[in-house]
Amino acid sequence: MRGGNGLQIHVVKQGDSLYSIASTYGTTYDAINVANELDNPNQLVVGQSLVIPIVGQFYFVQPGDSLYSISQRFGVNVQELAEINNISQNQPLEVGFRLYIPEIPEPTIEVNAYVEPTGNTVSETLENSAQKNAPYLTYLAPFNYRITREGELIAPPLNNFASIAANNNATLMLVVTNLEEGAFSAELGRIILTNETIQNNLLNNIIETAQQIGFRDVHFDFEFLPPENREDYNNFLRKAKERLSTAGLLMSTALAPKTSATQEGEWYEAHDYAAHGEIADFVVLMTYEWGYSGGPAMAVSPINPVRDVVEYALTEMPSEKIMLGQNLYGYDWTLPYVAGGEYAKALSPQQAIILARDENVAIEYDQEAQAPFFFYTDDEGNRHEVWFEDARSIQAKFDLIKELKLRGISYWKLGLAFPQNWLLLEDNFTIRKRG
């Protein structure tokens, strides 16, 4: 399976070893091991997807393929494809024949990643994750500055985030929320959006904080607002945009994943896609949590529902304002699902693969959702269902970004190990740096 230009995605089959895979692609054991950060390279999991670092990429001919159809798929001139593979343009291709696909130009996108410290400190693991992945980021977004009911700001621990961003030419994003006592507060949102004095105090504090610390984008993540405050939110954003632009700051917003302007539900109704698309410099669509910790087991960000949200957004705003939200986590559900019962446990893609290996189960792949999953039984006899992300699922999102010419991608959140994502991101795109 193709990745971008210089990576191939290989799904481990029964009998595969890292040595045999390396031989197939003309690379080395060490190169694959390092790229995928394998903790036990001699114990692969059937169904595990690996990224294979090569220059250009290989494609294995499928039934019904012709050289012309393959050249169209990859955007490569058919004559160039024939010449580089030493074959005739009109030569019938055998199924399984390996073609070399030369590199093609990469689209340029922006990349954001939220980073969420817990408690009053930034863990060493989280800071290391920010340091490691900042080269791939346009924006680094510490989550979050909470608002008081008087319009003051309560800062998160920042540690070295500002210097990490500066040293990697990434823009620091100031994330402002209506979180109160650990949950999004409709009442706090109502107070802020209906009181001009508090709004003015809040905007003064935001601008002062941004200038002191070096934030260059202000990102409003106001959720679960009262539906009757929809237009109040729009008016607040208009005022904020004017103030922030005068101060030389960008402004962005986070939007619940809607598929129509009239979608009902407390998460959706106060979010006006058309207004945000008009006012903000860009938006982040929160296109994840179809599978969530308190719900039934399913893919966290299945490709078709994600596409539905983006296609609706495109009817309300230009593609160059849309950042696709992407989870860096999966969930482990205990079966059977019972409403109000035990919450699913979050885990990283790397943790999911290790869990499948330890439980000696194969990883399956849902072609419709474009997501990997597996089942296992724990030591107490409880059945589990795990959905997560892998190289194939993230490549499907990258292909959607390219197809719909979106501004970029926004990750929730750093600190979850998924090395294949960052390699494929760099392989598929040129990442814009704002400096």
Task: List each language-model region with its residue ranges.
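Active-site groove signature of glycoside hydrolases
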Residues: 203-232, 282-296
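Substrate-binding surface in catalytic domains of secreted glycosidases
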Residues: 149-153, 231-235, 239-356
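Primarily a LysM-type cell-wall glycan-binding module
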Residues: 1-25, 48-75, 99
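Catalytic domains of carbohydrate-active enzymes, especially glycoside hydrolases
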Residues: 125-148, 205-218, 400-409
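Acidic/aromatic/glycine-rich contiguous surface patches that form carbohydrate-binding/processing clefts
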Residues: 397, 403-435
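Hydrophobic faces of well-ordered beta-strands that scaffold small-molecule active sites
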Residues: 111-115, 138-142, 172-176, 218-220, ...
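Glycan-recognition patch characteristic of GH18 chitinases/ENGases
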Residues: 104-201
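Glycan-binding loop/region signatures in secreted carbohydrate-active enzymes
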Residues: 178-184, 188-189, 330-397, 429-435
